[in-house]
Amino acid sequence: MVNQFATALRSRKPIGASFEFGLAPDSNINRATDSATLDTIIAPLDLSRDARQTSGLGVRAAGQAYLRAPLAKDLSFLPRVSGQGVLYRHSAFNDVSASAQLGLEWSPGRERIRPSAGASFRWYGGQLYARTATATIDWQHPLDGKSQLGAALTAGTTDYRLNHLQDGMLWNASIAYERAFDARSGGGITLVGTRQTARDPGYATVSGGVDLLYWREFGKTSAFVTLGGRRLEGDARLFLFPDRRREWTLSAGGGATLRALAWHGFAPLVRVEFERNWSTVGLYDYRRVAGTFGITRAF
């Protein structure tokens, strides 16, 4: 859905949106460890059942929309909104987020430059978990008829409502290269770096990673595979734990949109993803397999 929305946003359409709805089975809905106890500097810590790995079947809905309103030659007003949520029978694991951005799009020649400011909110278990205010600038530059380069810089402030020791600044930078291999296939590579500060240096982190994407059209079926890797380092150790956070994360996924079975523009969607996080702090060490089986549509 994100790729559908990004494609529409890169076009000159004055309005665009995408929507997704489906069932979402997940082996680890809370991205938690499967260990019953954790080692601490005092004594082994027993974890409650809801603090450990929990599987579940959720209902997932997500949507995004934008409006492009011309202000002058090569300049448009560009508001964007998005939201997504996964709801479970056990509401303590419900995960909902929403964001809104107001910005401009400047299009000198073939370039696209978009400065924007916005806010995002996340609710977990029915409670406001975090809110973030951000300022972003992204740039897109076609290299030739088959490839393009993109870059983005974001600065923001984060406010964690349940633990203010995590509050701090958020900095993110990314650069992406996309290429069409032929009329029916293509791919891309994205490099990402993130810095997050916090009142407690144990929650402050720096991370970097790479994401790979390959997509291909098979008749009226759009298929894709993804692969990603990420490294994270904590500034200091968290209270109770003997080591500071040092993590490797591996993610992989694949899916397909079956347009041959579309009904009134809504097409079946199948997506499967795998995630494994190795951490020196047992609380963050987990594995996860999840899927989405639903419908999607881009407008």
Where are the regions a protein language model picked out?
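Gram-negative and organellar
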Residues: 1-299
